[in-house]
Regions:
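Membrane-anchoring alpha-helices and their flanking helix-loop junctions
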Residues: 1-257
Length: 258
């Protein structure tokens, strides 16, 4: 199941290219070498984004919510997203190369999946060596089978250094989606000499609006099914870390085919 979900995601990005987007068996188009999946710059870029989200989580903005484990967390995802969006004009002014996202889009996706694996492993180790309250134990992730437990997650809401890991993964998914959209649109406008493709902009804007709405009502995340009933395993982390590369596939497709 772990391999299948990853294979489906990678297949979506290999089947749709600049020249065609036809249904076919994905195995013929899947890259066969390690270098086709792993890029050090992309891995460090995703890690840097995760570090930024982690640092921003300590901003004294937004309401505080008590999680199922009894830990109080600051719901400042909306302010984090706004701050990063407001940073975009500064990046353009400083002539920062934003083409990295488009050129290494596939590598960024695989890097996100790699970090999803690492994050799930951290959650597994925390549950093993620093278990939380009994109410935080996921019965479906405590079977004794390492693969099943790693996939399902032994705990619902593990925390590390005062940060809820599940909330961080949730922010990664939505804030990441918004930023990728904005960067793709900005880079597209700049590459076209200032000409705006309204279809691309509109498709991207709806996705950014979705992320803004989700982050504005972030405090209700802990009442969702994922927060209350899904263990923090690779099943969840891979889903959240890969999410930015599903809606943005539409934006990238429109840019490639314009």
């Amino acid at each position: 199941m772990m391999a299948l979900s990853t294979l489906i995601l990678i297949s979506l990005h290999t089947l749709c290219t600049k020249t065609s987007c036809k249904p076919a068996l994905p195995f013929d188009k899947l890259p066969k070498t390690k270098d086709a999946y792993i890029d050090q710059q992309a891995i460090m870029a995703v890690l840097g984004f995760m570090v930024v989200l982690r640092v921003m989580a300590f901003l004294p903005l937004g309401a505080t919510v008590r999680t199922a484990t009894g830990m109080e967390v600051r719901m400042n995802g909306f302010y984090t997203l706004l701050g990063l969006l407001f940073l975009m004009p500064a990046l353009v002014y400083k002539k920062v190369d934003l083409s990295l996202v488009r050129k290494k889009y596939f590598y960024l996706m695989t890097a996100s999946l790699i970090w999803a694996f690492v994050t799930a492993l951290i959650g597994r180790l925390l549950a093993r060596f620093r278990p939380g309250k009994k109410a935080n134990v996921n019965a479906r992730g405590n079977t004794g089978n390492f693969i099943v437990d790693f996939f399902k997650g032994r705990e619902f809401n593990p925390s590390l250094l005062g940060v809820d890991l599940k909330l961080q993964a949730y922010r990664f998914s939505l804030i990441g989606m918004a930023l990728i959209n904005v960067v793709l649109v900005i880079e597209n406008i700049m590459s076209r000499g200032g000409a705006v493709n309204h279809l691309v902009t509109l498709a991207s804007a709806f996705q950014v609006l979705y992320a803004l709405d989700a982050m504005f009502f972030e405090q209700y995340y802990f009442l969702s099914y994922d927060a209350m009933n899904t263990g923090f395993g690779f099943h969840l982390t891979s889903s959240l870390h890969s999410f930015p590369f599903l809606p943005t596939l539409i934006t990238k497709y429109l840019i490639d085919r314009q």
